Regions:
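Hydrophobic membrane-targeting segments
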Residues: 1-47
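Glycine-rich, flexible loop/turn motifs
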Residues: 4, 103, 148
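Predominantly long cytosolic amphipathic alpha-helical stalk/bundle segments
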Residues: 40-124, 131, 135-145, 178-205
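Residue-level signature of catalytic and energy-coupling elements of molecular machines
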Residues: 12, 26, 61, 76, ...
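Alpha-helical transmembrane segments of integral membrane proteins
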Residues: 15-28, 115-122, 169-173
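Pore-lining and gate-forming transmembrane alpha-helices of multi-pass membrane transport proteins
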Residues: 150-181
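Loop-to-transmembrane-helix entry motif
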Residues: 11, 15, 103, 107-121, ...
């Protein structure tokens, strides 16, 4: 623990900012993991519901996905209820599109923040390094040549510390943002597939 505080003191305010950004990034990653974990679930239940709907057992089809936790389950459940109430055609398609967009927008929340952290952290680290190098050379100049190589090397490694810290913050954030984006894309495709197949089945009956 003492080493961590020493590192924060050595890196100056830039390290403190990066530490706060790291804490924010880890918090966002944890929140998104909880939110996005179930978004690709329910595929088997939706297949069963579509089979039941095609066979004319609409009530059983609705019951099959009533407890679904994925966005595709929610959109399909709404579509089935709307069809039961007689809503069809462009009005239903527009409403399904709107609901699908809302689900995708909800899943995408905070992803931009992760991407921003991944982009800004290395730049902050580089800024800290540049400022540290400037300070080191200023101290060398004030020493008027009396400083030895070890003193100069100590100033340089302290300056490079912020670059390493910036990368340590950015890399997990970038990886998480990419993985989350891929999961969201798959969930969006599941929404489109579920709604489209239901409308196709209903229209062919």
């Amino acid at each position: 623990m003492a080493g961590t505080w020493d590192m924060l003191g050595t890196g100056g305010p830039v390290i403190v900012i990066l530490a706060l950004m790291s804490l924010l990034s880890l918090t966002v990653i944890a929140v998104k993991l909880i939110q996005l974990w179930p978004v690709r679930s329910g595929g088997q239940a939706r297949e069963q519901a579509l089979t039941q709907w095609k066979g004319g057992d609409r009530k059983q089809a609705q019951d099959s996905i009533a407890d679904g936790k994925s966005p595709a389950d929610r959109v399909m459940a709404y579509a089935m209820q709307a069809l039961q109430e007689g809503l069809r055609g462009p009005l239903l398609q527009d409403e399904l599109q709107r609901r699908g967009n809302e689900e995708v927008s909800r899943m995408n929340s905070l992803i931009r923040l992760l991407e921003l952290i991944a982009m800004v952290s290395p730049l902050l680290g580089l800024l800290g390094t540049v400022l540290g190098m400037i300070q080191s050379f200023q101290e060398l100049e004030l020493a008027q040549g009396a400083a030895n190589a070890s003193v100069l090397a100590g100033g340089i490694w302290q300056a490079l510390l912020t670059t390493a810290a910036g990368l340590l913050v950015a890399i997990p954030a970038a990886i998480a943002a990419g993985l989350f984006a891929a999961r969201i894309d798959a969930a969006a495709q599941a929404i489109e597939s579920a709604a489209g197949r239901l409308l196709l089945i209903d229209g062919s009956r």
